[in-house]
Amino acid sequence: MARTASFDRDAVVRAAMDAFWTTGYEGAGIADLERATGLRRSSIYNSFGSKRGLFDAAVEQYLDDVIRPRLEPLTAAPVSPDAVIGYLAGLRDAFADPASLAARSGCMLINTAGAPIGEDSAVAASVSAYRDELRAALKRGITARLPHLDPGAADRLADACTGQVVAALALARIDRSSATAAVDTALALIAAA
């Protein structure tokens, strides 16, 4: 008879999320995940099927705990005209603070896109879906702030701002000042529109 798992699944997934976020999928070995989660290898495999299964759960947790709460002011109805500026300013502040996880580790999904695991079709689809979610949120914020823009101009501005945010997220762990400058560029693009 199989034993029932006796651990807090959410706490385990969050601990794994932190490990993957900090060191990446390839950098987090099973021994590292055992230390981070407090589970033994057999429990990881029995509960999640594989290291990859735990990673997939960690990605979903990252979206739910980190990404969607930050995007919520841009996705809730109605969107405040100040929401997009608030989002970008918050991102800029996070990059400027050397103690913040965003400044030290960047974005778990953007980091994953540039790693070997990013070539996996399911992982690539998750990263692409995140980028689409980010773009849609930024477009809603841009439209709320600049209702006079025609739809094509709003689309182009959303594309440009999304590119700047993705660049900032990719740069955060290696060059915080460049990450901050990329966010400043997005803010300047909105101010100029």
What are these regions (language model features)?
Residues G90-A94, D132-A144, H148-P151, D155, ...:
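C-terminal peripheral helix-coil segments that are non-catalytic and often amphipathic
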Residues A15, A19-T22, P69, P73, ...:
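Solvent-exposed, amphipathic alpha-helical segments
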Residues D8-M17, L33, A58-Y62, V66, ...:
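Generic hydrophobic, amphipathic alpha-helix propensity
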Residues A11, A19-A58:
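Helix-turn-helix
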